[in-house]
Amino acid sequence: ADEKXVVIGLAADSG
């Protein structure tokens, strides 16, 4: 989820 970046929380979960 690096595309967003904003959603760092979800990004970490997604990997």
From Swiss-Prot:
Signal peptide: none annotated. It comes from the Eukaryota. The keyword Kinase applies. Pathway: Carbohydrate biosynthesis; Calvin cycle. It catalyses: D-ribulose 5-phosphate + ATP = D-ribulose 1,5-bisphosphate + ADP + H(+). Its EC number is 2.7.1.19. One of its GO terms (biological process) is reductive pentose-phosphate cycle. One of its GO terms (molecular function) is ATP binding. Keywords: ATP-binding, Calvin cycle, Kinase, Nucleotide-binding, Transferase. Heterodimer of a 40 kDa and a 41 kDa subunit. Belongs to the phosphoribulokinase family. This is Phosphoribulokinase, 41 kDa subunit. It comes from Selenastrum minutum.
